[in-house]
Every structure is written in C-alpha cells, then in structure tokens.
Amino acid sequence: MAEQLTSSFGAHWIPDDTPPQGQRAALHRLAAALRACTDLQMDTEAAEAELNAAAEAAEHFTARLAEAPRGRPLWGYAESSIAGSRRAQYDSSPVIGLGNPVAPPLRLSVVGDHVEGTATFGAAYEGPPGHVHGGIVSAAMDEVLGMTQSLSGS
C-alpha cells in the first residue's frame, strides 16, 4: 500500500526496510545499547560501587571512540524534500534515527490511507512523573505530520 500511495502522490519519503550492513549496522547496534543503558540508568537503585563501575566502563568506551577517526559522511537528510531519494536514511534524527542513541526511536508506517507512529518512550523521556514530556510528544507528532505531508507530494 505504501508504494501505491506514494506513487499516486509523488511522495518524497518511504521507509527503507533493508537491513543495514557493516559500519551502519554497528552504529545502529551501539545506539540501541546506549539507549538501553540510558533507560536503565534513569531509575536504577544500584549501589554506589556498581554505579562507579558502570561510569568507568562508559568512560573507557567513550575514550575508545574518541580515538577513532571523526567526520563520517552523513548518511541521511534533515528533510525528506531535499533527499533526492525516496529511500533516504534518517539515522541521525533525534526522533526516528536508528543511529542516534537519543531517539526513542519512533517507527513510522503507512497503514491504509493514514500514517502511524509507534514508539516506546522510556524513563529518559519523562516529564511529569510517569508521563512523557510534552516536548517529546510534540517532536514525535512533528515526524508523523512530516511523513504525512511528504506522502501528499506537496
């Protein structure tokens, strides 16, 4: 249905379900691990010694990454309308980017004649206790509405 809908409207964006390979797959894996670590850190009751050990491990891998070459080519685009490809990647997006440890990430799909977004917002996205921060909800809605606009071809 997504192909039919996007070809009808000349959309700029459709999801790419091709599994990443190589460095890009490793970047996705690292981002997922950092996301999980952040979520656990937000509400842990671990002892001081355990927290210090975790901090040392994080400092170690941060130093290791700091030694690696910097300035990787951008694998994505800020806006779908300038991507030039209907299967552009958005790995760096703070909302849908699978390569960004800050992203929940929100997964978007075309279902019938509408767009759906699915995400699990962990403790890192909490505003009022037990609730997602309104700014995070707004950012997620911006992505859903952006995809909707992109599918319109306008």
Task: For the regions a language model picked out, list residue spans one by one.
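Terminal targeting signals and extreme-terminal segments of soluble enzymes
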Residues: 1-154
